[in-house]
């Protein structure tokens, strides 16, 4: 049984599941083959149990179909390909968690756990076993201080928000904890695009030390990741005003570390960051290629999880896709729960506008909100910016908000939107280029001569328009947004490995943008 066959089945499952479900439960799985056995590694017990209960049956069906009826012995384990215990003995007809061998007590985040056997309901399914796995990367609490960096690392400014509370530590190092009081769960507008992320954040905020740890939120700019992070912090302080909750941008962590090295106060730096109750770090991708910062954060992360302290991280991309980030950090980020925050769909955009207008005590007609939401699709930040312009124009002109006033106040923005490439134009151009009919792109045909141009057209639509994935899917014959996401990723891979696809995409891009 080859890993390639497993990947084929995962790709098929990607098309069947909503992107949030796939990215949360299936994407973190790692796999390797040894003889006739296929080993699948989950990052933690929670993911393993969920996959076992919800997706194992379908995965085995796909393996059987693709493997021409020959099913492998499948083992589900906790850990990763680089960090695992020897495989458990295979037990017929049921999954079984083998008791761990006697070992020295490991750090809490990677402590072996056991569970009651889970019976596979179908007699014809192959034996499946689960076993815990122990990390081989122990926390090193007494990491020696090193000399200051030869070359100074860039240090970004902290978020421009009102300081809520100061936290001081013994010694020279002092730090301010930033939380924006206006970012709460109560004023966060929930929709299909952020439903799972909001639920996970609330679980952490309301059940500290019993929620997901770490919680990793990822997605494009202006989609609400930072809002949710602040909402967690504000809720924790509401429940316990004495809690040490620290929010900061990743570059602030770098700046504090450099300053501590310069002041010969690295021990105070460590003591401060490792004594918080909850550490909230925004834009973790800025740690990329900062080796010393990654080293220090690695030990800080381990210390916090060992002490049962909460860590919440955000990034603009899936952790495995952050280039220049050490694999050991990527692996640890998967210990808890990783959730995508998608661009808001039309209904959510309208709800956001109505909520913002209510907060500003402005009367916004529903048709006016709908008009703005239809034309501003990229992210919440741009949506709010457009609404502020409309409100200001209404105030200065002394006129109520109408569609006519919106056209006046946003005329430059709307003119820019009108110049954007349309999906119809992309479909027409791609069909002409590949000498097929537009109706073929919208059809259910799956032959390569049609499927590949369709994927190219979807990828171009994602790159050149502001339409959301669901909207692009509807434009291509009512397809699901997960199909669009799969097409975009597939074309991105082929542009790296296939010269013909790379040239086709380049030519089409030039045609559509000139």
From Swiss-Prot:
Plays an essential role in the initiation and regulation of chromosomal replication. ATP-DnaA binds to the origin of replication (oriC) to initiate formation of the DNA replication initiation complex once per cell cycle. Binds the DnaA box (a 9 base pair repeat at the origin) and separates the double-stranded (ds)DNA. Forms a right-handed helical filament on oriC DNA; dsDNA binds to the exterior of the filament while single-stranded (ss)DNA is stabiized in the filament's interior. Non-cooperatively binds DnaA boxes in the plasmid RK2 replication origin (oriV). In vitro in the presence of plasmid RK2-derived TrfA and E.coli protein HU, forms an open complex at oriV. This complex was not however competent for formation of a pre-priming complex with E.coli DnaB and DnaC. Broad host range plasmid RK2 requires not only DnaA for replication but also TrfA and host factors. The keyword DNA-binding applies. It is found in: Cytoplasm. NCBIfam families: DnaA. It holds the Pfam family Bac_DnaA. Residues 91-177 are annotated as: Domain II. ATP binds at residues 222, 224-226. GO terms for biological process: DNA replication; DNA replication initiation; regulation of DNA replication. InterPro entries: AAA+_ATPase, Chromosome_initiator_DnaA, Chromosome_initiator_DnaA-like, Chromosome_initiator_DnaA_CS, DnaA_C, DnaA_dom, DnaA_N_dom, DnaA_N_sf. Gene3D superfamilies: 1.10.1750.10, 1.10.8.60, 3.30.300.180, P-loop containing nucleotide triphosphate hydrolases. GO terms for molecular function: ATP binding; ATP hydrolysis activity; DNA replication origin binding; lipid binding. Belongs to the DnaA family. Transmembrane segments: none annotated. Its main location: cytoplasm. Keywords: ATP-binding, Cytoplasm, DNA replication, DNA-binding, Lipid-binding, Nucleotide-binding. Domain I is involved in oligomerization and binding regulators, domain II is flexibile and of varying length in different bacteria, domain III forms the AAA+ region, while domain IV binds dsDNA. GO terms for cellular component: cytoplasm; plasma membrane. SMART domains: AAA (SM00382), Bac_DnaA_C (SM00760). Residues 395-514 are annotated as: Domain IV, binds dsDNA. Residues 1-90 are annotated as: Domain I, interacts with DnaA modulators. This is Chromosomal replication initiator protein DnaA.
């Amino acid at each position: 049984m080859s890993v390639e066959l497993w990947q084929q089945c995962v790709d098929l499952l990607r098309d069947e599941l909503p992107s949030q479900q796939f990215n949360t439960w299936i994407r973190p799985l790692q796999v390797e083959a040894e003889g006739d056995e296929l080993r699948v590694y989950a990052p933690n017990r929670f993911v393993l149990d969920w996959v076992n209960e919800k997706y194992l049956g379908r995965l085995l069906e796909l393996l059987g179909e693709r493997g021409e009826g020959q099913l492998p012995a499948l083992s589900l384990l906790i850990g990763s390909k680089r960090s695992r215990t020897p495989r458990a003995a295979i037990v017929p007809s049921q999954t079984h968690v083998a008791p761990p061998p006697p070992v020295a007590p490991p750090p809490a985040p990677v402590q072996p756990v056991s569970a009651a056997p889970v019976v596979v309901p179908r007699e014809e399914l192959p034996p499946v076993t689960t076993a815990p796995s122990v990390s081989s990367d122990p926390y090193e609490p007494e990491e020696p201080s090193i000399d200051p960096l030869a070359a100074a690392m860039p240090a970004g400014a902290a978020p421009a928000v009102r300081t809520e509370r100061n936290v001081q530590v013994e010694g020279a190092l002092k730090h301010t904890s930033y939380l924006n009081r206006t970012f709460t769960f109560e004023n966060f507008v929930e929709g299909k695009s952020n439903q799972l992320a909001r639920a996970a954040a609330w679980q952490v905020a309301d059940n500290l030390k019993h929620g997901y740890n770490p919680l990793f939120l990822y997605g494009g700019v202006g989609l609400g990741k930072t809002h949710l992070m602040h909402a967690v912090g504000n809720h924790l302080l509401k429940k316990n005003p004495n809690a040490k909750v620290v929010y900061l941008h990743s570059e602030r962590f770098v700046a504090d570390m450099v300053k501590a090295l310069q002041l010969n106060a690295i021990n105070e730096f460590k003591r401060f960051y490792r004594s918080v109750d909850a550490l909230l770090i925004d834009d973790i991708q800025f740690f990329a290629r900062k080796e010393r910062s990654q080293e220090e954060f690695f030990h800080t992360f381990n210390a916090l999880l060992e002490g049962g302290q909460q860590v919440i991280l955000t990034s603009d991309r899936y952790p495995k896709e952050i280039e220049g980030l050490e694999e050991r950090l990527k692996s640890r980020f998967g210990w808890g729960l990783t959730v995508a925050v998608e661009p808001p769909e039309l209904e959510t955009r309208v709800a956001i506008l109505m909520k913002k207008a209510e907060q500003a005590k402005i009367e916004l007609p529903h048709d006016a909100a709908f008009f703005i939401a239809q034309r501003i699709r990229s992210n919440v930040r741009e949506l709010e910016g457009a609404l502020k312009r409309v409100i200001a124009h209404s105030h200065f002109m002394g006129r109520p908000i109408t569609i006519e006033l919106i056209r006046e106040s946003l005329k430059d923005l709307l003119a820019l939107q009108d110049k954007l490439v349309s999906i119809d134009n992309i479909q027409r151009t791609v069909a002409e280029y590949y000498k097929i009919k537009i109706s073929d792109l919208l059809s259910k045909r799956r032959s390569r001569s049609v499927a590949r141009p369709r994927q190219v057209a979807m990828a171009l639509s994602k790159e050149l328009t502001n339409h959301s994935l669901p909207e692009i899917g509807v434009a291509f014959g009512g397809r699901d947004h997960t199909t669009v996401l799969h097409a975009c990723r597939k074309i991105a891979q082929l542009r790296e490995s296939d010269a013909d696809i790379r040239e086709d995409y380049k030519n089409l891009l030039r045609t559509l943008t000139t």
